[in-house]
Design a protein with these regions (language model features):
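Radical SAM/AdoMet-radical enzyme domain recognition
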Residues: 1-102
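Generic structural "secondary-structure junction" signal
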Residues: 12, 105-108, 251, 256
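Low-complexity, compositionally biased segments
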Residues: 37, 51, 149-151, 245-254
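Radical SAM enzyme [4Fe-4S]-AdoMet core and its adjacent flexible, acidic
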Residues: 44, 62-238
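C-terminal target-recognition/interaction regions appended to catalytic cores
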Residues: 215-268
């Protein structure tokens, strides 16, 4: 279960946050977190919610309530903040990942200039590489089921004597071994298990908390990782998710089932 929220009540009502935390582990927060700048927030949300977001994170940290920060990206507005947002997220106890969503041209968008304001998945990926020292091109993997719309990376927050080290999962197993069904060169006798656990981790249907079992099993397959003191709280995920709109609509990607209309189809 995931709560999609602007964080206002979470920021104001710590008892409410405690109640939400009681629903874990099969529960997480999907928190709007677009920018640190007033002008951007005024444009995207109609209000400067900087202090609200920071207070919400503070309350979520108190209960270590699993949280994904959701960043709506618009070219010329906040694409230069990607690295800063990732750096902030990695320092928060409760944050399990960041989802970057290029603006979908639908609904309340007015006077949107597609030529100058629309940002693509590829551009977001490039911005992550330019602005974050943690991730390389090999770490950000297009998801095979829909590589034009989804890209994902996992990292481990590894405890050290001086604090914490962020290590992308692809330091332990290569993207080719995940995506191309090649045999693992790391642990030959466990390659099928590694492949299975990694594919499940790289599924958008798996929340970070629900990935705990897959994560634990995967750690057992990787001898270079001391996994006995690690849990899903050490897992950090980046997703770039591009929702279709009338400018990049792919009619082969929506369901013909009249009883199930995906949000991209409905909004477009």
């Amino acid at each position: 279960l995931m709560l999609n929220t602007n964080g206002i009540r979470i920021a104001k009502d710590v008892d409410f946050v405690e109640k939400l935390a009681s629903y874990m582990p099969d529960f997480e927060i999907y928190l709007q977190f677009d920018s640190f700048r007033k002008d951007v927030l005024m444009d995207l949300r109609g209000e400067d919610v900087t202090d609200v977001r920071k207070k919400a994170i503070e309350n979520l940290n108190k209960f270590n309530l699993s949280t994904t920060l959701v960043v709506v990206l618009q070219k010329g507005k906040n694409e230069d903040e990607i690295g800063e947002i990732l750096d902030f997220a990695l320092k928060q106890k409760c944050v399990r990942g960041v989802t970057f969503q290029p603006t979908q041209v639908a609904g309340r968008n007015e006077d949107f200039d597609v030529a100058t304001q629309k940002i693509t998945l590829t551009e977001v990926r490039r911005k992550i590489l330019e602005q974050s020292p943690v991730f390389t091109a090999e770490d950000l993997i297009p998801v095979p089921c829909n590589p034009d719309a989804l890209c994902m990376a996992y990292a481990l927050k590894m405890p050290t004597e001086n604090g914490e080290e962020i290590v992308p999962m692809t330091r332990y197993i290569s993207p080719e071994e995940i995506l191309n069904n090649a045999r693992s060169t790391i642990v030959y006798e466990h390659d099928e298990q590694i492949k299975e656990h990694m594919l499940k981790l790289f599924s958008t249907g798996t929340s970070v908390d629900c990935a705990e079992d897959e994560f634990g099993d995967l750690m057992c397959c990787l001898p270079r990782v001391k996994g006995e003191n690690l849990s899903y709280t050490n897992l950090f995920r980046i997703i770039i998710m591009n929702f279709m709109d009338c400018y990049d609509f792919d009619d082969g990607s929506f369901s013909p089932d009249v009883y199930r209309i995906i949000c991209c189809t409905y909004k477009s």
